[in-house]
């Protein structure tokens, strides 16, 4: 896996192509991403870099993390994220180095991970797109009910993974193979075609696409 970035979802807008076609884009504000740790094959058993992004009050940093940042000599960040390096990545990374939006370029495909908007406890129609049952014809209390959830005495249980009512959203989600439309190095912005997980202001992780 190649190195990525941690950014903040700033919202959505649109750009216009030369032929006038509107392209919906998500604007991601990339704050300073600083390398806080470099993991090596000899010491840690695998190669990776750990980056920290954003800013946070000193009172909001626990003692183990405060010591970790102090040892690295970097300012404590709001988010800590690790990127595993593969054998083809021969770049030399040092603690304290900054990773900027220039690691991506317009036209590149990326995967964006974030925490989806929480919708609370939802029924099967909203959560799983089930069809409603009859409004009339003798149906009185089961208009939005799921219906049968199993078989008979065999197997005598409900199978794991059965689509039922429950907590919707508020999960880690990755949207794959999104196109980078524009990179603004001066303002630290990434404009990515389409929607990405999370609410405005949420932290997202952008990595080169694994399926590109």
UniProtKB/Swiss-Prot annotation:
Query: Which gene does this sequence derive from?
Result: rplC
Q: One GO cellular component from the entry?
A: cytosolic large ribosomal subunit
Keyword vocabulary terms for this entry: Methylation, Ribonucleoprotein, Ribosomal protein, RNA-binding, rRNA-binding
What does the protein in this record do? Answer: One of the primary rRNA binding proteins, it binds directly near the 3'-end of the 23S rRNA, where it nucleates assembly of the 50S subunit.
Q: What is this protein called?
A: Large ribosomal subunit protein uL3
Listed under subunit, the entry gives: Part of the 50S ribosomal subunit. Forms a cluster with proteins L14 and L19.
The family annotation for this protein states: Belongs to the universal ribosomal protein uL3 family.
PROSITE patterns noted in UniProt: RIBOSOMAL_L3
* PANTHER family xrefs: 50S RIBOSOMAL PROTEIN L3, LARGE RIBOSOMAL SUBUNIT PROTEIN UL3C
| Region annotation (Disordered) ranges | 135-155
Q: Does the keyword Translocase apply?
A: no
Question: Which Gene Ontology terms cover its molecular function?
Answer: rRNA binding; structural constituent of ribosome
Residues modified as N5-methylglutamine are 153
Q: Give the residue spans that cross the bilayer.
A: none
- What are the recorded Gene Ontology BP terms? translation
PTM per Swiss-Prot/TrEMBL: Methylated by PrmB.
């Amino acid at each position: 896996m190649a190195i990525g970035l941690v950014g903040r979802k700033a919202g959505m807008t649109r750009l216009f192509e030369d032929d006038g076609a509107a392209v919906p884009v998500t604007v991601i504000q990339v704050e300073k991403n600083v390398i806080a740790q470099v993991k090596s094959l000899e010491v840690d058993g695998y190669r990776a870099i750990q980056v920290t992004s954003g800013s946070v009050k000193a009172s909001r940093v626990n003692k183990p993390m405060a010591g970790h940042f102090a040892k690295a000599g970097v300012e404590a960040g709001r988010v800590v994220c690790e990127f595993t390096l593969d054998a083809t990545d021969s770049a030399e990374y040092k603690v304290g180095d900054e990773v900027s939006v220039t690691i991506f370029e317009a036209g590149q495909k990326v995967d964006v991970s974030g925490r989806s908007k929480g919708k609370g406890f939802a029924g099967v129609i909203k959560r799983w797109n089930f069809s409603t049952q009859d409004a009339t014809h003798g149906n009185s209390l089961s208009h939005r009910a799921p219906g049968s959830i199993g078989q008979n005495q065999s197997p005598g249980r409900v199978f794991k993974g059965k689509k039922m009512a429950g907590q919707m959203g508020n999960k880690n989600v990755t949207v794959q193979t999104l196109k980078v439309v524009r990179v603004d190095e001066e303002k630290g912005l990434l404009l990515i075609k389409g929607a990405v997980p999370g609410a405005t202001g949420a932290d997202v992780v952008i990595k080169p696409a694994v399926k590109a």
